Amino acid sequence: MNQPLSYVHPDAKIAKTVVIEPFSTIDKNVVIGEGTWVGSNVTILEGTRIGKNCSIFPGAVISGVPQDLKFNGEDTTAEIGDNTVIRECVTINRGTSDRNKTVIGKNCLIMAYSHIAHDCLLGDYCIFSNNSTLAGHVTIGDHVTLAGMVAVHQFCNIGRHSFIAGGSLVRKDIPPYVNCLLYTSPSPRD
């Protein structure tokens, strides 16, 4: 059900049970699955693929142009799995020619003000607390939790079932099943 005060591009493929609140924008080349709710003031840009039963809260921007100087307008995507919740003011960039997509798995919770950069791959059942930030090309396994204000350096990998404590800076790979209570990986000068 589209509100008259939202804009939906005529080429967007929106399932019949999708609810789009006022003042949201849905661009061309977008697919949104059954039962998904799009809050007010959400911007869903070209190349977005959203699964079934997702919730996108106000102020979120999905599939923004990658913040990568090598990006040259390639046809890339940002994909969000079924039952995922994207909270207020989250930004998710689409991929570059490196991976061609940014992927958020199924049953994830991405809390307010988090940023997921281009070419990131997130597994299923991930939880990102407020202000968690991934630089480009990061890979996150299933069931990973990032507490508030975690920053992950580009090209890092975080193994499945890991937990990263709030305020941590991750500059190196984290193996699976690791509980990082406060992690700031050593500086190259240390």
Model-identified regions with their sequence ranges:
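Structural signal for interior beta-strand "rungs" in well-ordered beta-sheet cores
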Residues: 2-180
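Conserved small/polar residues in nucleotide/adenosyl-binding loops
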Residues: 183-190
